[in-house]
């Protein structure tokens, strides 16, 4: 995110200072971005941090680990509700939801999506191919109070920004939300359960 001049502030919340130290030691090419003047690092539990925020963020990226142990709180209704409150009216939250090819991950994805969908008026799942992740196929959640990721996508406005990205394109954006039939079925069952 620090590559983009339009980004004014980044709050990085990490519970364990050793994670930041390890990144600086072993991933210096990426970790050097933490020294950017716009980056503010907070060493605390993200659930506690986000509880204190209201109408503050345009974007929340939840790059959590697995939904158990220290990160378990980042998969709760309380956390998603706090993220909802921390976002501005036009804010967006994205989060990792795992791989659908492993039973535990698929169950966690369903649970996470159900909790987000019960909190945000707009909640979608999108996909990406990430060779270094398990199965090389990963799911993410998109949640917003206002914007639908496809219906409100303005490709002309994005392209007019003339931002150089390594992966993202407006065409890929739309395609990422078109899921395989088995995933659509999993999510449809969840949404029907929410409506009851």
Outline where the language-model segments fall.
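Conserved beta-strand signature within the Rossmann-like core of class I S-adenosyl-L-methionine
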Residues: 90-97
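SAM/dcSAM-binding transferase cores
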Residues: 135-196
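Conserved Class I S-adenosyl-L-methionine
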Residues: 80-84, 106-129, 141
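The AdoMet/dcAdoMet-binding core of the Class I SAM-like
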Residues: 1-90, 103-109
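Short, solvent-exposed coil/turn elements at secondary-structure transition points
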Residues: 47, 99, 129-131, 146
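Flexible, active-site-adjacent loop/turn segments at secondary-structure boundaries
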Residues: 25, 32, 72-73, 131, ...
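Short "lid" loop at the C-terminus of a central beta-strand within the Rossmann-like core
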Residues: 66-67, 98-102, 131-132
């Amino acid at each position: 995110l620090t590559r983009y001049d339009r980004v004014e502030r980044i709050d990085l919340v990490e519970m364990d200072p050793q994670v930041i130290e390890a990144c600086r030691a072993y991933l210096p090419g990426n970790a050097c971005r933490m020294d950017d003047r716009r980056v503010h690092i907070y060493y605390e539990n993200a659930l506690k941090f986000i509880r204190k925020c209201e109408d503050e963020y345009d974007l929340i990226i939840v790059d959590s680990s697995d939904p158990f142990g220290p990160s378990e709180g980042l998969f709760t209704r309380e956390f998603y509700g706090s993220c909802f409150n921390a976002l501005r009216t036009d804010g967006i939250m994205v989060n990792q939801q795992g791989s659908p090819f492993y039973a535990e991950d698929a169950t966690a994805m369903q649970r996470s999506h159900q909790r987000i969908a019960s909190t945000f008026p707009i909640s979608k799942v999108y996909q990406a191919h990430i060779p270094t992740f398990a199965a090389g196929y990963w799911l993410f959640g998109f949640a917003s109070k206002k914007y639908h990721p496809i219906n409100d996508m303005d490709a002309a406005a994005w392209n007019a920004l003339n931002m150089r990205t390594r992966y993202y394109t407006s065409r890929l954006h739309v395609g990422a939300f078109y899921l395989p039939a088995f995933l659509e079925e999993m999510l449809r069952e969840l949404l029907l359960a929410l409506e009851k």
